[in-house]
């Protein structure tokens, strides 16, 4: 089930030259699992933009997106206080109800954001999580520090690239 709503931009900041993190305030009751996504309507664009949810709580949603075209470039220019029309609670997401004792999460590029909330959920359930991240270049790396704490034996980020 999904919900359409208007969400207020709280933050919109670059993480790298091409990757941005946007935090939105609004109703999150239809988001039920890590790995779900939203569809964003943008002024002057016919199609909505699907963006995976990085994190959420009962009042806000964090999205991470890469600027790859006109729509995401338009998003990168948006300022706190502006609003967006979203469809939320889309996709099945990831289930954490399984017998996995040591889950291995693998993601790269814009496939990394949905793993953040999944890792948080699994850790809250007492499951030690291992994370493998991939990026095209070192300049494109983001959220490595946020996900590094989930690894059972933290490595020096400078030598692990």
Residue ranges of each PLM-predicted region?
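Conserved S-adenosyl-L-methionine
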Residues: 124-128
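Histidine-anchored nucleotide/phosphate-binding helix
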Residues: 114-123
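Conserved small/polar residues in nucleotide/adenosyl-binding loops
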Residues: 149-154
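Short internal beta-strands
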Residues: 129-136
């Amino acid at each position: 089930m999904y919900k359409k709503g208007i969400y207020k931009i709280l933050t919109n900041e670059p993480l790298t030259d091409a990757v941005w993190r946007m935090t939105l305030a609004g109703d999150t009751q239809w988001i039920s699992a890590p790995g779900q996504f939203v569809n964003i309507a943008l002024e002057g664009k016919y199609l909505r933009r699907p963006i995976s949810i990085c994190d959420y709580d009962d009042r806000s949603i964090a999205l991470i997106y890469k600027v790859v075209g006109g729509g995401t470039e338009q998003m990168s220019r948006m300022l706190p206080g502006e609003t967006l029309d979203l469809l939320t609670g889309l996709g099945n997401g990831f289930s954490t109800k399984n017998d996995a004792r040591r889950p291995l999460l693998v993601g790269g590029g814009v496939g990394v954001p949905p793993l953040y909330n999944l890792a948080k959920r699994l850790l809250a359930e007492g499951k030690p999580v291992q994370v493998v991240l991939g990026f095209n270049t070192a300049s494109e790396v983001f959220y490595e520090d946020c996900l590094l704490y989930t690894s059972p034996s933290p490595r020096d980020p400078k030598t692990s690239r």
